[in-house]
Amino acid sequence: MTHPLAEKFAKTFGAQPDLMAQAPGRVNLIGEHIDYSQGFVLPFAIDLYTSVAIRKRNDGIVRIASSQRNQNFETFEVSEIKPGYGTGWAKYPLGVLWALEISEGLDIFIDGKVPSGAGLSSSAALECSLAFAINELFHLGRSLKDLALLSQKAENDYVGVPCGIMDQSISLMGKSGFALLIDCSDLSTTLVPLDLTRADLQLLIIDTGVHHALVDGGYAERRASCESAAAKIGVASMRQLSAALLENNQKNLTNSEF
């Protein structure tokens, strides 16, 4: 039986994919606005995924389609891929191709089950599933840590979102039944058992109705406040900040920085 994703790919592009991959969204248990301050975070992967199917082309053309956009593809020139090229949602997969320095054409079909704008890292799931697939298809030999950093680079430098490294790390390195303790100063990780069923517990993910947008939301402002506060206090990042040091410098900080 043909995989449903392969069927969608074939219907859109007229051929079977060379390779398929998927990566999950995530929930963070603790550590908000900490990853870009080099602190500790404790996310875990969820059972909602973004899947990709890809196929090599020999003409330097990149065609990208999504089941969330009526399976119609957009066409790009691989030689033109650099920050500023492409618009909207297509900048995410284009950014991954740019970060991984891909110079060959591709057909890419994306099937996302992670709700967009829900704070579950749909963008990281897209980036990581595609980065993993490209790494396998082109035999790049990149580690999962490398792929996380390259996916973050795509979002930071191509899409223009100053996200930290947490979302990409858990999407690529998460494991069922575990949370992942990430030290964002060096990306060292520790699997932490999270067997909720055995403890007779359930963790609820509730839709608050508030749309989460990293590109035009308050995320960039919050990160800028953290970085400017650290600079004023004289530390490399907020991770190095003690409660006493923060209190002693309150008069030098704006309300948002404090």
Indicate residue ranges for each PLM-predicted region.
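Gly/Ser-rich oxyanion-binding loop with an adjacent helix/lid
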Residues: M1-L19, N28, S37-F40, F73, ...
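C-terminal nucleotide
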Residues: M1-R26, S51-G86, L181-F258
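N-terminal cofactor/phosphate-binding cores enriched in small/glycine residues
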Residues: G31-H33, I46
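Short Gly/aromatic-enriched secondary-structure transition segments
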Residues: Q38-A45, R222-R223
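Short, charge-rich binding segments
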Residues: P43-A45, A53-K56, E101
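A short, structural micro-pattern
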Residues: I46-L48, M173-S176, T197-D200
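A generic structural motif
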Residues: D47-Y49, D59, P115, G177
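Residues at beta-strand starts and edge strands
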Residues: L48, E104, I108, D200-Q202
